[in-house]
Amino acid sequence: MRQRRHLIILLFALTATLPSMGQNGINSPFSQYGIGASHLPFNMPAASALGGVVYSRSASNMVNPFNPASYGAVASETLVFDMGLNIEMSTLRDKANSQYDADGNIGYLAVAFPLTKWWKTSLGVMPVSEVSYQSTLTSGINPGGEVKTIYEGTGGVSRFFWGHGFNILGGTDPTKTQLRAGFNINFLYGSLTRAVTYDFVANDTTYFMDSRRQKDTYVKNIIFDLGMQYEQPIGEKYRLMAGVTLTPSRKMNVLDNALVYTFVTQAGSEYMRDTIFPVDGDSEFESSLEQPFTTGIGLAFQRNDKWLVAFDATLSPWNGLKYAENSTYSVFGQSPIRYDKNTRLALGFQLLGDRNSAKYVRRMTFSLGTHYEKGCLKLQLTDGNDYRLDEWGIAFGVSMPMRKGRSVLNITAGYTSYGTVDLLRRDTFTFGISVGSCESWFVKRKFN
């Protein structure tokens, strides 16, 4: 009992570190819109290895927050601790230039345990999105000189979830038909800072003064998602699995703090001079971001202890939705971004390990996955063209059993390509490692 309490205290202590870890990420100009760029579900190495397949997946030594029904697969009298780490190496490129960057972070932390034989619960935290970019545009001005326009942003949004999974049919017996349902209560929290700085370098500074437009956004919202999973044995060798998730649409309110001002730089330090906005001294106002109704569907077919093939589809109609500033003053002016329908398709294949084999290599599971995502962002640029930002990727992973197969170590390597070289493309190599530990924590020991 004391060990369980210490583990849960550790989870909550590490929760506070996640937002700060997400604020030193890879330079990504794509993250300047909305609440930033999201890497879900690829921040979870076990999911990334299968191309992002998550909706039909469940295991006794894994926490799958992307379908809360999966918590029902947690065995009685056990506690599951799941943690993942990721390292990214990314290159931004267009037709003429390229830039390399690298970063590492905690992908997620989660625990799951039974409340009764049919009711299981999970607690966890993971980053949802990240804002991390800096770029400079230099242009000439008259009379003589130039102006540097610096775009920069930092921050991120994290998700703390409390999930519940219920065994409706079959319990955790793999020889029986199983039906599970569940839901997550998700608390989104975080802060985002975006700024545009105009740095004038002119022969005559009488007509020019450095200025900055800055907006801090604070996110605190609660959202819900629902899930179901169904597993059906087919004969003695095969098994069909299906999963579905629903995330209801929601208008998320955020608090913005905006400031537009001029400044002077002396001896390397900045000093504010004149405030352009707000004129009345109140820089805070509420804004809103609409989240669409999102549907996830997954199917998997397995030959017991041999192989598994799985497919996922995610549908999010972002088209028509927008980020609404409830202010009479537009801090950054008209955005060139437009939201489009978002579709993500994932396909994965596994060679399953034989848990009874005497050779360790044969007990290992090997995964291969790929995904394609029709992005929700579409840029409308001054050349009159629309650029939709799509993504595709491929990944490979290996799962190595520990402690007689009850716990597992997952190692994943993957590649993704996002955007287009005609505008800007990000090529990323990702390496992930996660540990899923399943321990007997609720058994009363008997002593003679």
Please place each PLM-identified region on the residue numbering.
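Bacterial N-terminal signal peptides that target proteins for export
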Residues: M1-I8
